């Protein structure tokens, strides 16, 4: 973590857990993904920077999933689990039932595996995470719902978009200002589930 990074400094000053908070703030301000009262499923939630922002907007139930622990956030049910674990479906469905959630208004993923520095490998790993998130999400997303996913851009990005965009009215690709400029990370936004 670069302690001279302006987003890091700002996050500390504004009591956000990570600089990533400003990514979701910018994306949501531009695309209105999450609104008050929405039920949200979030992948890759730890340490909770996105979760804090989302809870402040929705003031409703968030189900957050991460392989790493996360300190509590108001109105958030946290599931500490690897999304590739076979029990992930059951765990999410149980949390939904416990909180009277039939389906989600928005699903967000900032999930990423540890980077290796090998671009093709990092892209492939992020692609597989996005595929898994979509497999979990599509049956649990309401009509009209939205999904955001982080992916390292690469040669499978277009294939991924082509595969999943048919479930939605349209999609966008964005790179928030808070993303490091040298990073290949992009955010794929699928809007208005059909």
UniProtKB/Swiss-Prot annotation:
It comes from the Archaea. Belongs to the class I-like SAM-binding methyltransferase superfamily. RNA methyltransferase RlmE family. The gene is rlmE. GO terms for cellular component: cytoplasm. InterPro entries: RNA_methyltr_RlmE, RNA_MeTrfase_FtsJ_dom, rRNA-MeTfrase_E, SAM-dependent_MTases_sf. It catalyses: uridine(2552) in 23S rRNA + S-adenosyl-L-methionine = 2'-O-methyluridine(2552) in 23S rRNA + S-adenosyl-L-homocysteine + H(+). Keywords: Cytoplasm, Methyltransferase, rRNA processing, S-adenosyl-L-methionine, Transferase. S-adenosyl-L-methionine binds at residues 48, 50, 66, 82, 110. It is found in: Cytoplasm. The active site is at residue 150. Pfam families: FtsJ. One of its GO terms (molecular function) is rRNA (uridine-2'-O-)-methyltransferase activity. Gene3D superfamilies: Vaccinia Virus protein VP39. The keyword Nuclease does not apply. Its EC number is 2.1.1.166. It comes from Picrophilus torridus (strain ATCC 700027 / DSM 9790 / JCM 10055 / NBRC 100828 / KAW 2/3). Specifically methylates the uridine in position 2552 of 23S rRNA at the 2'-O position of the ribose in the fully assembled 50S ribosomal subunit. It is an enzyme of class 2 (transferase). This is Ribosomal RNA large subunit methyltransferase E.
């Amino acid at each position: 973590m670069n302690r001279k990074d302006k987003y890091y400094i700002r996050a500390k000053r504004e009591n956000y857990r990570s600089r990533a908070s400003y990514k979701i703030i910018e994306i949501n301000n531009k695309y209105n993904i999450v609104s008050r009262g929405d039920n949200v499923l979030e992948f890759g939630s730890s340490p909770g920077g996105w979760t804090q922002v989302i809870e402040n907007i929705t003031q409703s139930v968030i189900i957050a999933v991460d392989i790493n622990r996360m300190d509590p956030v108001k109105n958030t049910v946290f599931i500490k689990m690897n999304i590739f674990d076979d029990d992930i479906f059951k765990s999410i469905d149980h949390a939904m039932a416990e909180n009277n959630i039939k389906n989600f208004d928005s699903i967000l993923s900032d999930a990423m595996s540890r980077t290796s520095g090998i671009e093709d490998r990092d892209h492939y790993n992020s692609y597989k995470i996005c595929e898994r998130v979509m497999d979990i999400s599509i049956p649990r997303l309401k009509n009209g719902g939205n999904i955001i996913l982080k992916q390292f851009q690469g040669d499978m990005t277009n294939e991924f978009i082509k595969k999943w965009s048919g479930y939605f009215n349209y999609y966008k690709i964005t790179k928030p200002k808070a993303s490091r400029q040298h990073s290949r990370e992009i955010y794929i936004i699928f809007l208005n589930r059909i």
